[in-house]
């Protein structure tokens, strides 16, 4: 190991809780193995290394889940998480899975997992746990989308899958709240999932589907310019500029650069959000994330366009801090997400 790598390793361990450090470090090792220099990806090995869990109709921590095929044509699955019924003495039957929601207003979070468009899935253990936590915190239903991944399925496949999932959620009668017979939808995601949430929200505004809010955790944005955070944090806390460049090349249309609107939504080629129907946003930025400056620029772009945005800039947080409840940043963000969702419900 090079001396500079040793310094970065030691420094990251002084900032990151040990179990988070182990988790993210293991991801980094696996990710480095899976990416190939020619732009291809070892999907077979990726699936083998990704620890997955099955849906569970027997409530776990007060939440039960089931998988639904929402588009047979592209084999698009989603995992639905629901609070256990208060009066339920037996495990839910197949007839209970799509039982109308219980409550005057029940928020529904459409969730997109992270992984830089290439890694993880809706049934990855870390995201299964996160979605269960969101159900408990927000007293909501969560629909986690198993979108198609790059490089096999580049832009705009993930956005198309998110759009299909949004329409599916919006059309489910059993997700409609009793008070107004509407589905109270929020979009959420981390890393690439936050990027997908933004782009699905754009389509929703154009189509008239009402989305109440966007929740973006360390959203993955970028651009051609090398920002201060990319220069100063390159390789320091798990992620390198070269890593990020590989993922953008894998996802973006062939021949495109990082000024493409999928990467840089407020570039000259991006869609103006001034006067556009767009949900209010909660943008969470980890100060030690390599692409911090792009995330801050995204929040500022929303503000300049006249859109409502709340920014949480956690200066000493790193990527993945929200995956384990072992730090104050985790608890503060979860409380903020709960308040953000329930303020509209």
Swiss-Prot record:
What's an example of a GO molecular-function annotation for this chain? hydrolase activity
Q: Where are residues bearing N-acetylalanine located in the sequence?
A: 2
**Phenotype of gene-disrupted mutants:** No visible phenotype under normal growth condition.
User: Does this UniProt record's set of keywords contain Acetylation?
Assistant: yes
GO biological process terms on file = cellular response to hypoxia; floral organ morphogenesis; fruit morphogenesis; gibberellin mediated signaling pathway; positive regulation of fertilization; positive regulation of gibberellic acid mediated signaling pathway; response to gibberellin
Q: Which InterPro entries match?
A: AB_hydrolase_3, AB_hydrolase_fold, Carboxylest/Gibb_receptor, Lipase_GDXG_HIS_AS, Lipase_GDXG_put_SER_AS
Q: In which tissues is it expressed?
A: Widely expressed.
Q: Which residues form the active site?
A: 191, 289
The Enzyme Commission number assigned here is: 3.-.-.-
Keywords in alphabetical order: Acetylation, Gibberellin signaling pathway, Hydrolase, Nucleus, Receptor
Pfam families assigned to the protein according to its UniProt record, in alphabetical order? Abhydrolase_3
Quote the subcellular location field of this record: Nucleus
- What are the binding positions for gibberellin A3 in this chain? 116, 127, 191, 238, 320
Task: Map motif Involved in the stabilization of the negatively charged intermediate by the formation of the oxyanion hole onto the chain.
Answer: 113-115
Give coiled-coil spans as residue ranges: none
Q: Name one GO cellular component term.
A: nucleus
Q: Please tell me where gibberellin A4 binds in this chain.
A: 115-116, 127, 191, 320
Q: Give the quaternary structure.
A: Interacts (via N-terminus) with the DELLA proteins GAI, RGA, RGL1, RGL2 and RGL3 (via N-terminus) in a GA-dependent manner.
Record's family?
Belongs to the 'GDXG' lipolytic enzyme family.
What does this protein's UniProt record list under function?
Answer: Functions as a soluble gibberellin (GA) receptor. GA is an essential hormone that regulates growth and development in plants. Binds with high affinity the biologically active gibberellin GA4, but has no affinity for the biologically inactive GAs. In response to GA, interacts with specific DELLA proteins, known as repressors of GA-induced growth, and targets them for degradation via proteasome. Seems to be required for GA signaling that controls root growth, seed germination, stem elongation and flower development. Partially redundant with GID1B and GID1C.
Q: What is this protein called?
A: Gibberellin receptor GID1A
């Amino acid at each position: 190991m090079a001396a500079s790598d040793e310094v970065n390793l030691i420094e990251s361990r002084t900032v990151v809780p040990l179990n988070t450090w182990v988790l993210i470090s293991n991801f980094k090792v696996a990710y480095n193995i899976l990416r190939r220099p020619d732009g291809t990806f070892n999907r077979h090995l990726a699936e083998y290394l990704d620890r997955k869990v099955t849906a569970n109709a027997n409530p776990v921590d007060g939440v039960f889940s089931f998988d639904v095929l929402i588009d047979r044509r592209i084999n698009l699955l989603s995992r639905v998480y629901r609070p256990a019924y208060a009066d339920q003495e037996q495990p839910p039957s197949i007839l209970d899975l799509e039982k109308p929601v219980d409550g005057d207003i029940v928020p529904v979070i459409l969730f997109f997992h992270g992984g830089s468009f290439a890694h993880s899935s809706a049934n990855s253990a870390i995201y299964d746990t996160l979605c269960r936590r969101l159900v408990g915190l927000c007293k909501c239903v969560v629909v986690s989308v198993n979108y198609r991944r790059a490089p096999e399925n580049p832009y705009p496949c993930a956005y198309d899958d998110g759009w299909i999932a949004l329409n599916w959620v919006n059309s489910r009668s059993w997700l409609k709240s009793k008070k107004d017979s509407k589905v109270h939808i929020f979009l959420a995601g981390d890393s690439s999932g936050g990027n997908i949430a933004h782009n699905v929200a754009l389509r929703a505004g154009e189509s008239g589907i009402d989305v109440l809010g966007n929740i973006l955790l360390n959203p993955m944005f970028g651009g051609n310019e090398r920002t201060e955070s990319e220069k100063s944090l390159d390789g320091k806390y798990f992620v390198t500029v070269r890593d990020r460049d590989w993922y953008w090349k894998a996802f973006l249309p062939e021949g495109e650069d990082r000024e493409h609107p999928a990467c840089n939504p407020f570039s000259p080629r991006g869609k103006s959000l001034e006067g556009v129907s767009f949900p209010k946003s909660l943008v969470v930025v980890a100060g030690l994330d390599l692409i911090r400056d792009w995330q801050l620029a995204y929040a500022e772009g929303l503000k300049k366009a006249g859109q409502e945005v709340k920014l949480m800039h956690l200066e000493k947080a790193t990527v993945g801090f929200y995956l384990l409840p072992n730090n104050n940043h985790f608890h503060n963000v979860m409380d903020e997400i709960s308040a953000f969702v329930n303020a509209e419900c």
